[in-house]
Amino acid sequence: EVENMSKSNTMESAQLTDAMYYILLSLMIERHGYAIMKYIEELSNQSITMGPGTLYTLLKKLCRAEWILQTSVTADRTKKYQITDTGRQVLLHEVARRKRMVEDGLRILEENGYEG
């Protein structure tokens, strides 16, 4: 139990790449690989496109970290994934971190005469 706690604390302090961030967001509901790619493109207004190679490498990494879980494999071998409780904590932490960064940026720009 103690070992698992320290592991998740370490994970929470890790900064996510943009790709990992969007994968975690997309897995708030269960999705398969192709649906994840499509959802990320939609969510980011096509500013983030992810190829299958990148996606599946990151899905493996996120599974190993126990931030996501492979939930099922269908008859046609399509794998589905969903975020775990640990992954949700990591995501909440990351959203808060990115929000603070944006707020800092807007404040400094405003102080220097730029309109937000």
Indicate residue ranges for each PLM-predicted region:
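Short, hydrophobic-biased segments on the C-terminal half of alpha helices
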Residues: Y56-K60
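N-terminal helix-turn-helix DNA-binding core of bacterial DNA-binding proteins
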Residues: M11-T54
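Beta-hairpin "wing" of winged helix-turn-helix
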Residues: C63-D76, Q82
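Conserved amphipathic alpha-helical interaction elements at protein-protein interfaces in regulatory
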Residues: E42, Q46, K61-R64, D104, ...
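Basic, amphipathic "hinge/linker" alpha-helix immediately C-terminal to the N-terminal HTH DNA-binding motif
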Residues: A75-V95
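Intrinsically disordered, low-complexity serine/threonine- and proline-rich regulatory segments
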Residues: E1-Q15, R98
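Amphipathic alpha-helical dimerization/coiled-coil segments
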Residues: N4, L92-G116
